[in-house]
């Protein structure tokens, strides 16, 4: 009697396999490794940093989280690279995790990014994005988990853009802390096409990582761009759209703060540089001090292939007008000080009157962009039911109002509400051209004793008012 061994088919991966993974446990495991990398970097133990980074990237937990980041969590997860893949079903996500195993990664080659042009808010020109293929995005997310903690231990105090636990409001708060007791001169600067012109050589030298990782990052930088089917090689820059691009830009710009401060003597007074990605301001008590900052920053930027954008670089003062303007705009805020009498004046740490007050408000450009965005939603839903219009307007209004909730925005909110009311009244009247304004108002608005007139649909949905925030 002959016996034969049964050949078992490999288990079929299902959506449940992905959903049932212990995500909290995986996150804790990766976080512990990242904390060890951070501490080793703080100690300056380069060998330990590189060893732990390799350990993290071999970790199945880190590989799973990297794939989840680019297929499930990330806002750009539905944007395809040149592979045309926009999304993956859970079983395919597990296959992508397998592709991040070191043996597979070594054999893979970085593929060109797909050029996508998106409009700049409030401007006619467009901004280029470079979208990597999904496999490269997942690999970049894995590498970012390993490299970011090393640099978080090293990044300068006043770098706020694209960093965990930091954001726009922290940068604004830092500026307020510098100027609240004493007015300052300001170099309000912008780097020309920062992401497109960073020197690869300077970036890789600053990165100073181990050879295999250096080669991986170099391959992404040199992968090239496919724009409408035409391939273009890349010799500089890190395309916006890659998972790791903001981190690489921050690494390239690291050292700017120290370079500026080192140019000053103690007697001159050290300036303060506050940076959010490629936007930054430098503050100093004297005009000569700001001129010196501009002279110091330009050659430093040249060492990494960058330069200031003249049309967006100016010297301002927070209290007094310079060239007809007082204060400056930063991250959608207007930051300015106003001379006031003793009743409204702030006080210094000793209780003495300052003679001015500092106000931070939404900038005029930010208000115009918001009004334009809201207007586009209304126009797009001219024939839609009221409830559908409310559903699409509310996230735009809430997001904008939430961003400015910590600054002096009451008047700006009221202006936007008034403008939106007139827009909605026109929207409603054109749907019922033969009806009176009173009839239209009763159909689309309802009066609430606490909130006043509300744009309310028959299903009970209500348009959010910005003045409520």
What residue ranges belong to the model's regions?
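Non-catalytic terminal/accessory segments
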Residues: 1-469
């Amino acid at each position: 009697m002959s016996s034969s061994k049964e050949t078992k088919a490999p288990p079929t991966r299902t959506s449940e396999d992905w959903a049932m993974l212990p995500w909290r446990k995986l996150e804790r495991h990766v976080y512990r490794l990242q904390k060890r990398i951070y501490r080793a970097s703080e100690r300056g133990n380069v060998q330990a940093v590189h060893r732990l980074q390799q350990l993290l990237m071999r970790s199945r937990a880190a590989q799973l989280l990297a794939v989840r980041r680019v297929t499930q969590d990330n806002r750009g997860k539905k944007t395809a690279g040149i592979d045309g893949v926009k999304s993956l079903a859970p079983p395919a996500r597990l296959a992508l995790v397998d592709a991040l195993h070191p043996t597979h990664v070594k054999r893979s080659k970085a593929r060109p990014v797909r050029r996508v042009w998106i409009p700049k808010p409030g401007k006619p020109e467009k901004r280029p994005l470079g979208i990597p293929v999904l496999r490269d995005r997942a690999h970049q997310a894995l590498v970012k988990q390993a490299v970011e903690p090393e640099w978080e231990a090293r990044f300068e105090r006043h770098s706020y853009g694209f960093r965990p636990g930091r954001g726009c409001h922290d940068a604004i708060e830092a500026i307020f802390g510098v100027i609240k007791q004493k007015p300052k001169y300001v170099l309000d600067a912008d780097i020309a096409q920062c992401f497109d012109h960073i020197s690869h050589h300077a970036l890789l030298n600053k990165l100073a990582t181990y050879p295999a990782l250096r080669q991986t990052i170099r391959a992404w930088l040199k992968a090239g761009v496919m724009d409408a089917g035409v391939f273009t090689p890349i010799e500089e820059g890190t395309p916006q759209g890659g998972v790791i691009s903001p981190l690489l830009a921050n690494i390239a710009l690291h050292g700017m703060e120290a370079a500026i401060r080192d140019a000053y003597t103690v007697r001159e007074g050290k300036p303060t540089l506050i940076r959010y990605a490629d936007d930054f301001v430098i503050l100093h008590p004297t005009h000569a001090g700001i001129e010196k900052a501009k002279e110091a920053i330009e050659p430093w930027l040249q060492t990494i292939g960058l330069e200031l954008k003249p049309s967006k670089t100016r010297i301002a003062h927070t209290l007094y007008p310079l060239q007809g303007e007082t204060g400056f705009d930063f991250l959608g805020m207007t930051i300015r000080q106003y001379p006031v009498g003793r009743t409204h004046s702030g006080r210094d740490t000793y209780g003495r009157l300052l003679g001015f007050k500092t106000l931070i408000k939404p900038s005029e450009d930010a208000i115009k962009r918001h009004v334009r965005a809201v207007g586009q939603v209304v126009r797009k839903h001219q024939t839609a039911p009221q409830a559908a219009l409310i559903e699409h307007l509310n996230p735009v209004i809430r997001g904008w109002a939430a961003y400015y909730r910590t600054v002096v925005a009451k008047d700006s909110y009221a202006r936007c509400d008034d403008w939106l009311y007139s827009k909605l009244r026109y929207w409603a009247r054109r749907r019922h051209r033969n009806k009176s304004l009173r009839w239209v108002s009763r159909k689309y608005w309802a009066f609430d004793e606490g909130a006043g007139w509300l744009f309310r649909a028959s299903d009970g949905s209500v348009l959010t008012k910005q003045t409520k925030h």
